[in-house]
Amino acid sequence: MEFEVKKTFGKARLGVMKLHHGAVETPVFMPVGTNANVKLLTPRDLEEAGAEIILSNTFHLMLKPGVEIIKLHRGLHNFMGWKRPILTDSGGFQVFSLPKIRIDDEGVVFRSPIDGSKVFLNPEISMEVQIALGSDICMVFDHCPVPDADYEEVKEATERTYRWALRSKKAFKTENQALFGIVQGGIYPDLRRESALQLTSIGFDGYAIGGLSIGEERSLTLEMTEVTVEFLPEDKPRYFMGGGSPELILELVDRGVDMFDSVFPTRIARHGTALTWNGKLNLKASYNKRSLEPVDERCGCYTCKNFTRSYIHHLFDRGEVLGQILLTIHNINFMISLMKEVRRSIESGTFKELKSKVVEVYSSGGVNV
């Protein structure tokens, strides 16, 4: 892959990644399609929203449908009908989020969330699966510590992440895919620095900031991001794993981060909350019952062009899945539009003004929450 920083505004960067399935402008938000689909959306919905790259999950696809089924389709792109770039997570986040039977230097034995059977995953298996999936960007297999881990536990996870990164790179034998390293270190600046230096000494196509936005205070999220970015190379993309709220993304862009993913926009849509340029909007609330306004007057998505707040409120009131679909369409369109505005503002030198507005309306809870 190739990455070029075209312009900067402070630490905020306007760039472009050239990947096997196309170019991706940064800063970029990646909708999450864990099981080879973004919940409730078709690939055409994503294309119409302007999504340039999506994320899928190695661990879950390894379980169902299984690598052999995806190989029958000659890769994940054909399997899910998506022609643009894909990033696959390595399964490392599941070290933190799923029940584990055993974790040591060799790898992790999980309890399958599907049938309770034992599943073994290590750097070599993760690389083998991601190569078979054919994703444009693959992630090293890492050890993401739990939020309440003490210093020694985080240190052990950080050292293991380094050893697993070495093994991941050694096992990554492919030409058309990129491999990103993942920096760990929890909320400890010295471990963040150590991890960043270790990963950059190996050399990867890009670097992710992992193990944050998992329950720690926002101030710590931002502080640890600053510490990490300081030791990452200028000529490689930087990816904050799991950051998806508008105000957090703007804060992170201001600190030099280029890539983001989260289930946040789609998850809150399924629960009746829309993201707008004035903050969050609760479509379940009774004050929308008679509203003839669109979800967001500034939005040109299918939902906002064709339906009123009143209608979407009615759909949620009656438990109709169409309400969830329409808000998911809108929220993904909003996030893609937000990132376009971020890129324009870096280009035009107005990023600070955009950031101030977005942080203000979302940090205050927005309107009609």
Curated annotation (Swiss-Prot):
Binding site residues for substrate: D89, S90, G91, G92, F93, D142, Q184, G211
Cofactor: binding comment: Binds 1 zinc ion per subunit.
Name of one Pfam family that matches: TGT
SUPFAM superfamilies assigned: tRNA-guanine transglycosylase (SSF51713)
EC number: 2.4.2.29
Active site: D89 (proton acceptor), D261 (nucleophile)
Residues the entry annotates as binding Zn(2+): C299, C301, C304, H330
Domain of life: Bacteria
Region (RNA binding): 242-248, 266-270
InterPro entries per the UniProt record, alphabetical: ArchSynthase1/Queuine_TRR, TGT, TGT-like_sf, tRNA_ribo_trans-like
Pathway terms, separated by semicolons: tRNA modification; tRNA-queuosine biosynthesis
GO cellular component term, pick one: cytosol
Enzymatic reactions: 7-aminomethyl-7-carbaguanine + guanosine(34) in tRNA = 7-aminomethyl-7-carbaguanosine(34) in tRNA + guanine
Biological-process GO terms, alphabetical: queuosine biosynthetic process; tRNA wobble guanine modification; tRNA-guanine transglycosylation
Key word Glycosyltransferase present: yes
The protein's required cofactors: Zn(2+)
Subunit record text: Homodimer. Within each dimer, one monomer is responsible for RNA recognition and catalysis, while the other monomer binds to the replacement base PreQ1.
Entries under NCBIfam families matching the protein: Q_tRNA_tgt, tgt_general
HAMAP family linked to this entry: Q_tRNA_Tgt
Function: Catalyzes the base-exchange of a guanine (G) residue with the queuine precursor 7-aminomethyl-7-deazaguanine (PreQ1) at position 34 (anticodon wobble position) in tRNAs with GU(N) anticodons (tRNA-Asp, -Asn, -His and -Tyr). Catalysis occurs through a double-displacement mechanism. The nucleophile active site attacks the C1' of nucleotide 34 to detach the guanine base from the RNA, forming a covalent enzyme-RNA intermediate. The proton acceptor active site deprotonates the incoming PreQ1, allowing a nucleophilic attack on the C1' of the ribose to form the product.
Protein name: Queuine tRNA-ribosyltransferase
